UniProtKB/Swiss-Prot annotation:
Enzyme class: transferase
Record-level GO BP terms: rRNA base methylation
Protein name: Ribosomal RNA small subunit methyltransferase H
Subcellular location: Cytoplasm
Species the sequence originates in: Rhizobium rhizogenes (strain K84 / ATCC BAA-868) (Agrobacterium radiobacter)
Main location: cytoplasm
Role according to the record: Specifically methylates the N4 position of cytidine in position 1402 (C1402) of 16S rRNA.
Family as reported in the entry's similarity comment: Belongs to the methyltransferase superfamily. RsmH family.
Domain of life: Bacteria
Length: 341
């Protein structure tokens, strides 16, 4: 990816890039792509990172659970014959698509892509009216299923744990009352109700529906569970000296990545579920600063970068440890009642 004569970006094929990859310079510095290296992009999206890594000479495996992203990326595959393999898959399964201990790098850009937000029919954005869907693939329950059929207590838990929404009870009660009259069908249906229940104040920096939409998206796609499993998978797939680079966009995701690197650094630690443990050999060493955020200049150009955080680790030669989800202290939503139950 390079700057074009108009000051914008072009991909490696010379075409315009709509999506602006967040923290691109910092990602490349941490990942260190080079000819002869094999790197996996677990979140292909619009191909921003993949294009830049290919331009640096590395070969790529790229994954995305969204079939639309896979279809859109076929031109990039054709332009880099033999150097890019594009696979429809959840990134939690990345170890199934790479030689065990054979990757030089893994990059994960967590969260919804700008391409998905731009398409109203995907139902991710409250600013664009479309079906209340939010699924990154066609399978599983949709956001409309959750909003129309989940029990009141379950809605509150989803909004509190996954959206950190302080007005969760008020919003959930309003949803329950409204759906008894007519089901929620579109993003505007839900966003409009939330605007009425919790009107935006002058000091508010975000839309009142932001946290509820975030919570529904995370729940529908099991994003926190996917991220946790992807980190364990990357640990197995990286060779000694391989690099894991993760970009997150809100505190729930960043907390998981931070806890993973802390646990895998060999430092003693524990949680409310696990006692303190003795120091052990590290499977990852830190790369640079513990956390990197976007500069003011980048945030001005690309508003999506304002909340971005980058964490990276260098794989050691120590054998990968068993996957243990308890280290993340994730909210237990597995006990939610069946929709409509």
């Amino acid at each position: 990816m390079v700057a074009n004569s108009g000051g914008g970006l072009t991909d490696a094929d010379g075409g315009p890039v709509r999506h602006i990859p967040v923290l691109l310079k910092e990602v490349l510095e941490a990942l260190a792509p080079a000819p002869g290296k094999l790197i996996l992009d677990g979140t292909f999206g619009a191909g921003g990172y993949t294009s830049a890594i290919l331009a640096a000479g590395a070969d790529m495996i790229a994954l995305d659970r969204d079939p639309t992203a896979i279809a859109a990326g076929q031109s990039m595959v054709a332009a880099h014959a033999g150097r890019l393999t594009l696979i429809q898959s959840q990134f939690s399964q990345l170890a199934d698509h790479a030689p065990q201990g054979g990757l030089d790098g893994v990059v994960l850009d967590i969260g919804v892509s700008s391409m998905q937000l731009d398409e109203a029919e995907r139902g991710f954005s409250f600013s664009k009216n479309g079906p209340l869907d939010m699924r990154m693939s066609a399978s599983g329950v949709s956001a409309a299923d959750v909003v129309n059929h989940a029990k009141l207590a379950d809605l509150i838990r989803i909004f509190v744990f996954l959206g950190e929404e302080k007005q969760a009870p008020r919003i959930a009660h309003a949803i329950e009352k409204r759906r008894a009259e007519a089901p929620f069908v579109t993003t505007r249906d839900l966003a409009g109700l939330i605007e009425i229940v919790t009107p935006r104040k002058a000091k508010d920096k975000i839309h009142p529906a932001t946290r509820v939409f975030q919570a529904l998206r995370i729940f529908v796609n099991d994003e926190l569970g996917e991220l946790a499993q992807a980190l364990f998978a990357a640990e197995r797939a990286l060779k000694p000296g391989g690099r894991l680079v993760v970009v997150t966009f809100h505190s729930l995701e960043d907390r998981i990545v931070k806890k993973f690197f802390a646990d895998r650094s060999g430092r003693a630690g524990g949680s409310r579920h696990m006692p303190m443990v003795h120091e052990r050999l590290a499977t990852f060493d830190p790369i640079g600063k513990p956390m990197i955020s976007a500069s003011d200049a980048e945030a001005e150009i690309n508003p999506r970068a304002r909340s971005a955080k980058l964490r990276a680790g260098l794989r050691t030669s120590v054998q990968a440890e068993a996957a243990d989800l308890s280290i993340f202290d994730l909210p237990n939503l597995a006990s939610l009642g069946k929709l409509g139950g």
